[in-house]
């Protein structure tokens, strides 16, 4: 197997150059984000900014808790007074790496965007390490890292921050393959660390990676004779990964089981892939012209990548030293592709995904099985890179000439010499096609509302209310779609400045108490709405007058249960205090 130990052990300042290249690529592929790095956040292909704004709030909450040693981490200030509100969504504790930016700057966008660019650079670097290990070639490793940094799925989902983080997946595969090559215990330990970090950065990716490995890993384990070291290393990896994952996963599972959440089958089916989705891409190239009416998600890695992946698979299977890793990558790809179909996956008249959802904790809560497609695209890039693996090479090669020789040796050995060079340059052209076809369009950007315009009411709330007071931003969302909650996530952004608990909020799941309260306050400020808010512990109502229906605005002065405490100069934002009933003493835990 070409995944040589020395391919990753060459610690040399040259890696700084690689990181610099990936940084330039990350900035260029997300441009013009860098020009508005402290004022806007990318939305990718998201129609609205709800999810990016929610992740912006998540970055702040992790930074806020990091400053307090992560005390009360799960009791996030949303859906108050509900407990463990942060367990309702992706926690992303890895975003704490940009906590100093949050602490020293009022720009939440700056921290968010620096984290995003860092993760894209990490994708490129981790990809180059993995591909270099597979091919024993630094130049091919850089090209592979670039292709993984530009992965179509990531840039399509650029508005979903956690889905931009591939490095955990790539490093897990890298150290796992290294361990199964040489049985070094440090590789087993690092595989466990990488798996754990994968889950921390993106719960979806961590879960999908572990589930796919469960079915694909036996190919790498077959015919391994050193059972003792295999068992020891496997135990180390599992223990280390569990030690990292369980402190996050257990509270999430506990909260989920307490609320008995399961996704609606029609929702999961709607967000599952179909085979035709793998023929569609948003970017340039022949497959981008697909108009198949059945295709809904652009999941294709591109024609050039698909073609080169087939070539790499054939070349990898022909070589003894790459045969097993090629079989593993092929099975990894097939399993991920089938799982991406969700309930639509039919095998011998049965639906395997539904059976798995009954037995595997957490799978029944998965909303978007089509996200398994990211593993399909990663597998295609890795298989394509195997086209460049040398035959029986003991030393890593570092230049383009050597890469060309590796191509000729691996794929043209059985052909006449005059065809070898043509094949060599043909494959180089295909790899260039992969990069060109993967180059994304400019991402959509959401310009954050100006804080200075909101400063008066935010500062009043921060100085005139108690830290434990509960605030309701009104009106509440009336719908259930993501777009209906954009105003709510803007309110969550302002809460990062006034730091008061919110009665409303947005998350992957919603507490039942909030769902009931939401239904009860749709006619605010009628008596029922105010009484229900009061019973929920709400003391302050921040009312966006422009968003409230005109008849309801007219009701505000006549509502005896509310007293106006503050109004902005333009009259658009009012803060009301909910008056307690007679002989009622406000008490808060």
Residue ranges and their predicted role:
Residues 4-6, 178-180, 209-242, 313-322, ...:
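Perimembrane helix-loop-helix junctions
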Residues 17-24, 193-194, 226-250, 327-335, ...:
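Hydrophobic alpha-helical membrane-interfacial segments at the cytosolic entry of transmembrane helices
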Residues 22, 115-134, 138-221, 237-241, ...:
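Membrane-embedded helix bundles of polyisoprenyl
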Residues 25-123, 147, 151-156, 160-166, ...:
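Membrane-interface coil-to-helix junctions
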Residues 44-65, 246-316, 361, 365, ...:
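Periplasmic/ER-lumenal interhelical loops and adjacent helix-loop junctions
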Residues 214, 234-242, 382, 388-438:
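Signature aromatic-anchored transmembrane alpha helix within multi-pass, membrane-resident enzymes
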Residues 261-272, 429-589:
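Extracytoplasmic
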Residues 302-338, 389:
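Hydrophobic, aromatic-rich transmembrane alpha-helices
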């Amino acid at each position: 197997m070409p995944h040589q130990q020395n391919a990753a052990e060459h610690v040399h300042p040259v890696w700084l150059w690689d990181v610099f290249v990936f940084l330039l690529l990350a900035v260029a592929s997300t441009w013009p984000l860098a020009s508005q790095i402290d004022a806007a956040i990318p939305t990718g292909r998201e129609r609205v900014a709800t999810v990016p704004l929610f992740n912006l709030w998540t970055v702040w909450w992790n930074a806020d808790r990091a400053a307090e040693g992560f005390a009360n981490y799960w009791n996030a200030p949303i859906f108050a007074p509900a407990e463990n509100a942060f367990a309702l969504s992706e926690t992303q504790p890895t975003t704490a790496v940009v906590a100093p930016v949050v602490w020293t700057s009022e720009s939440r966008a700056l921290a968010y965007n620096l984290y995003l660019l860092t993760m894209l650079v990490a994708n490129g670097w981790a990809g180059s390490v993995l591909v270099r290990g597979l091919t024993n070639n630094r130049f091919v490793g850089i090209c592979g890292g670039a292709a993984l940094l530009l992965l179509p799925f990531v840039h399509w989902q650029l508005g979903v921050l956690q889905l931009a983080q591939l490095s955990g997946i790539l490093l897990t595969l890298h150290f796992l393959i290294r361990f199964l090559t040489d049985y070094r215990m440090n590789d087993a330990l690092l595989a466990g660390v990488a798996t754990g970090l994968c889950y921390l950065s993106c719960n979806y990716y961590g879960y999908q990676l572990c589930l796919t490995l469960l079915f694909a890993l036996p190919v790498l384990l077959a015919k391994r004779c050193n059972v003792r070291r295999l068992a020891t290393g496997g135990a180390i990896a599992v223990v280390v990964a569990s030690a990292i994952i369980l402190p996050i996963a257990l509270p999430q599972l506990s909260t989920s089981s307490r609320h008995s959440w399961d996704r609606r089958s029609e929702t999961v089916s709607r967000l599952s892939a179909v085979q035709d989705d793998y023929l569609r891409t948003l970017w340039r190239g022949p497959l981008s012209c697909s108009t198949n009416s059945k295709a809904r998600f652009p999941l294709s890695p591109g024609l050039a990548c698909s073609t080169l992946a087939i070539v790499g698979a054939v070349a990898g299977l022909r070589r003894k030293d790459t045969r097993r890793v090629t079989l593993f990558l092929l099975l990894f790809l097939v399993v991920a592709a089938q799982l991406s179909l969700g309930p639509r996956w039919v095998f011998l008249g049965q639906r395997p995904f539904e059976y798995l959802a009954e037995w595997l904790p957490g799978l029944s809560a998965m909303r978007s099985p089509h996200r398994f497609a990211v593993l399909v695209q990663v597998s295609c890039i890795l298989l394509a890179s195997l086209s460049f693996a040398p035959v029986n090479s003991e030393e890593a090669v570092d230049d383009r000439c050597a890469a060309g020789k590796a191509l000729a040796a691996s794929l043209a050995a059985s052909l006449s010499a005059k065809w070898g060079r043509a094949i060599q340059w043909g494959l180089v052209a295909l790899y260039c096609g992969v990069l060109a076809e993967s180059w994304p369009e400019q991402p959509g950007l959401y310009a954050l509302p100006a804080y200075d315009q909101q400063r008066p009411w935010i500062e009043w709330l921060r100085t005139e209310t108690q830290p434990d007071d509960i605030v309701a931003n009104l009106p509440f969302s009336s719908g259930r779609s993501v777009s209906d909650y954009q105003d709510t996530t803007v309110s969550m952004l302002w809460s990062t400045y006034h730091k008061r608990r919110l009665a409303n909020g947005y998350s992957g799941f919603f507490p039942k108490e909030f769902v009931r309260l939401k239904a009860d306050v749709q006619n605010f400020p009628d008596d029922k709405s105010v009484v229900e808010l009061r019973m929920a512990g709400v003391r302050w109502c921040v009312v966006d007058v422009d968003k409230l229906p005109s008849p309801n605005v007219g009701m505000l002065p006549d509502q005896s249960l509310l007293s106006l405490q503050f109004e902005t100069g333009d009259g658009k934002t009012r803060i009301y205090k909910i008056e307690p009933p007679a002989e009622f003493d406000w008490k808060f835990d």
